[in-house]
Amino acid sequence: MTVDSALRSPMMHSPSTKDVKALRFIEEMTRNVDFVQKKVIREILSRNSDTEYLKRFGLKGFTDRKTFKTKVPVVIYDDLKPEIQRIANGDRSMILSSYPITEFLTSSGTSAGERKLMPTIDEDMDRRQLLYSLLMPVMNLYVPGLDKGKALYFLFVKTESKTPGGLPARPVLTSYYKSEQFKRRPNDPYNVYTSPNEAILCPDSSQSMYTQMLCGLLMRHEVLRLGAVFASGLLRAIGFLQTNWKELADDISTGTLSSRISDPAIKESMSKILTKPDQELADFITSVCGQDNSWEGIITKIWPNTKYLDVIVTGAMAQYIPMLEYYSGGLPMACTMYASSESYFGINLKPMCKPSEVSYTIMPNMAYFEFLPHHEVPTEKSELVELADVEVGKEYELVITTYAGLNRYRVGDILQVTGFYNSAPQFKFVRRKNVLLSIESDKTDEAELQSAVENASLLLGEQGTRVIEYTSYAETKTIPGHYVIYWELLVKDQTNPPNDEVMARCCLEMEESLNSVYRQSRVADKSIGPLEIRVVKNGTFEELMDYAISRGASINQYKVPRCVSFTPIMELLDSRVVSTHFSPALPHWSPERRR
């Protein structure tokens, strides 16, 4: 087998001609990383040489990396906000890009609830489409026969807004699903969805979810893979099924669509799918989903031919792995690509690996990439590293320059180099930068907080209780301040929930899991008070998501913020608290442990 033995031969079955073309492209890109990067930055600087932004820094037509890096500063969003606001307000001069900005892609919500607007040009859609076209050729090397069935993917759009200057402002996936490239995509047996476009494109997420779930049930034997953008989205779909299975079964039993569906386009499309009663299927759903039955393994019970789950379970999404394993009966979870509102970055060349082993290979044609070494103690001036020159084992913050006019922009993702494929580095997503809890000199990042929650939740295992969702904030109104962690629990035995003693031990276990600076502040400095866990009612985090969506967040991109500070969110959480628990003792700390 050619094409470097089909990406070094995972299963050794022959790829199709179309797949071979895609695999050869991957080989070409990954063997010539530095050459491609030089070409990309030369193209970007040549095209955008007359922009106001690049003229400001005196590039004078130079297109080499050295001049660019010497003259153009590394920036964050706030540095570009004046230029972005001018474009949003209708200024059509060449501010950031020589090509017209056709829309803004909005970032997912932050703890403060503010959206960022990322400028986009028409041809960016082609770059995204190119990356999408590489996913199935790689997956086909590992999972044969995906052309013999369909994908049940829960995909959603959000009603877009307009900037004062009339440009669309919408999440990247809404932009993609509404594009002609998606709506008029050619027939591909490897990418057949159970959901009709009309359901995906419906702005009412409830009608969309209901229709997509109904289609998935009607075609349950054809489904070979289930997915959503994030792991939390797939769990939300399972939760929807738990709440609405009776109504769904009624539709199947009668062969008629629920009155909850009012969208004309959905009704028209479903008239061709829900064509007749199917009592046998309705009875099956009732028997499987009935309240007396366990929902463990529900995915494979309903969709028995499912080969894997297609969801992102890296970074903050890793905490959902146990719940997905529970509902799926241990199906593999595939993380296929790495992308953001700023740009699409790369793909996972081993998509069926364990979630803890996921690494993404950056495709050097997508943008110009630089890497800021990430230090525990920041240095005053760190030299940025080229894509081809990063070192295995080191952590970097991703910095990008895009065709649409982001120049040396700090994305905020912290990545660790895990190895190389040809000359292309492979990265593990570590965390978002500055997602922290801090009372004093302590700094707790997202990865540490997640690890602490996981360790503490092990104490609940004997009773079959799980932490299904969490967030946090730094309570500074008390003296001293302390960490507050909100937990939503799935209690197996409602007559025997975890008592205060168990929950207090969870508080202490979390503190034991935090870094030495935190423990020193607790023990020696007395500058941090006991950690507090507030247990909230079931459904609270669904309400939190609904609130975020009502304020403009995308259902596709929504992620539970792991640290909150926005007052209405805090008030919502506190209004749902059913019990509070504090750490009963000091965590262990000694000067010898400070490193």
From Swiss-Prot:
<comment type="similarity">
    <text>Belongs to the IAA-amido conjugating enzyme family.</text>
</comment>
<comment type="function">
    <text>Catalyzes the synthesis of indole-3-acetic acid (IAA)-amino acid conjugates, providing a mechanism for the plant to cope with the presence of excess auxin. Strongly reactive with Glu, Gln, Trp, Asp, Ala, Leu, Phe, Gly, Tyr, Met, Ile and Val. Little or no product formation with His, Ser, Thr, Arg, Lys, or Cys. Also active on pyruvic and butyric acid analogs of IAA, PAA and the synthetic auxin naphthaleneacetic acid (NAA). The two chlorinated synthetic auxin herbicides 2,4-D and 3,6-dichloro-o-anisic acid (dicamba) cannot be used as substrates.</text>
</comment>
<dbReference type="Pfam" id="PF23571">
    <property type="entry name" value="GH3_M"/>
</dbReference>
<dbReference type="Pfam" id="PF23572">
    <property type="entry name" value="GH3_C"/>
</dbReference>
<dbReference type="InterPro" id="IPR055378">
    <property type="entry name" value="GH3_C"/>
</dbReference>
<dbReference type="GO" id="GO:0010279">
    <property type="term" value="F:indole-3-acetic acid amido synthetase activity"/>
</dbReference>
<protein>
    <recommendedName>
        <fullName>Indole-3-acetic acid-amido synthetase GH3.3</fullName>
        <ecNumber>6.3.2.-</ecNumber>
    </recommendedName>
</protein>
<keyword id="KW-0436">Ligase</keyword>
<dbReference type="InterPro" id="IPR055377">
    <property type="entry name" value="GH3_M"/>
</dbReference>
<dbReference type="Pfam" id="PF03321">
    <property type="entry name" value="GH3"/>
</dbReference>
<dbReference type="InterPro" id="IPR004993">
    <property type="entry name" value="GH3"/>
</dbReference>
